[in-house]
């Protein structure tokens, strides 16, 4: 697991502290229409040249524009239809939970074209609600929770999401948790091969109060417990910057996630 962070927030590039992987190089060399306006500049090691992480799938497919992926009402007070996790062990319920102004959780689940639920579009954006209790900030794996989902820019009703209907496709799950009061953001994601993860597709985690030098705790069951993640976890980053809520934040996050997902799937 690797860690990178920036203290400077939204208006500065995120500086990678590692060499580019083959997938990262391939992604940086892509020149499709940029998923406007989402780009993030990175310093290319050994060159001193900024490169853009484009919000496009590594397989060449494209997501819709940022505007079409945003709900009409977002963040504070938002309650949307979502994926129903009730069919998987440890993933119960579909009761909507509203976000609040202090601690928000954001989840991104990326499905490769050959993946599950073939009757619906293959580009999937999942924005998850959060727990408001102090001990369990994060994806609900043991409590009732609704997971709003956007299919190709449009909101659709609950869709069953269980190991039995995942098919042969690979899901990459990304989770972000943020504390507005401290400006602390944490992102965790894992590669959910069905052979390695069968009863949970998004691993729960907790986020303690931390400074820029502290790492977040990953693992657990979503109820405050902390346990080691399995080998399917590919990466984690902590971005303790005072980001403003809204489209600009999502632009930065999504562009970066696309760059990281390129490494996972490429």
Predicted regions, residues:
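Short surface loop/edge beta-strand patches of beta-sandwich-type extracellular domains
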Residues: 13-28, 84-106, 158-165, 222-225
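Extracellular glycan-recognition modules
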Residues: 45, 51-54, 61-68, 72, ...
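Extracytoplasmic low-complexity segments
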Residues: 1-87, 249-266
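Short hydrophobic/aromatic patches on beta-strands that form ligand-binding or substrate-lining surfaces
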Residues: 34-37, 42-43, 56, 105-114, ...
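Short tryptophan-centered beta-strand motifs in secreted/extracellular beta-sheet-rich domains
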Residues: 106-108, 164-180, 185-187
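Extracellular glycan-interaction patches encoded by glycine-rich segments
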Residues: 210-234
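Short, solvent-exposed beta-strand-to-loop segments that form ligand-recognition rims
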Residues: 189-213
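Short, aromatic/His-centered strand-loop micro-motif at the edge of beta-sheets
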Residues: 94, 148-176
């Amino acid at each position: 697991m690797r860690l990178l962070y920036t203290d400077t927030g939204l208006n500065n590039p995120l500086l990678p502290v590692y060499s580019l992987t083959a997938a990262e190089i391939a992604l940086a060399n892509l020149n499709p229409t940029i998923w406007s306006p989402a780009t993030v500049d990175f310093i290319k090691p050994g060159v001193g040249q900024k490169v853009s992480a484009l919000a496009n799938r590594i397989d060449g497919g494209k997501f819709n524009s940022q505007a079409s992926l945003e709900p009409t009402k977002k963040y504070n007070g938002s309650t949307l239809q979502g994926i129903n996790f009730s069919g998987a062990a440890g993933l119960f319920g579909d009761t909507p939970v509203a976000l609040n102004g202090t601690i928000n959780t954001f989840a991104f689940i990326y499905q490769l074209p050959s993946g599950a639920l073939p009757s619906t579009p293959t580009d999937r954006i999942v924005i998850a609600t959060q727990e408001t209790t102090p001990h369990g900030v994060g994806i609900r794996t043991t409590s009732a929770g609704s997971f709003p989902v956007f299919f190709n820019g449009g909101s659709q009703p609950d869709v069953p999401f269980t190991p039995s209907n995942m098919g042969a496709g690979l899901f990459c799950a990304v989770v972000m948790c943020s504390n507005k009061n401290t400006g602390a953001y944490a992102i965790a994601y894992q590669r959910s091969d069905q052979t390695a993860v069968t009863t949970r597709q998004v691993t729960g985690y907790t986020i303690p109060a931390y400074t820029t030098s502290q790492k977040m705790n990953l693992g657990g069951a979503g109820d405050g417990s902390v346990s080691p993640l399995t080998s399917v976890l590919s990466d984690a980053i902590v971005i303790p910057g005072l980001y403003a809520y809204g489209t600009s934040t999502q632009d930065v996050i999504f562009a970066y996630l696309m760059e990281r997902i390129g490494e996972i799937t490429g």
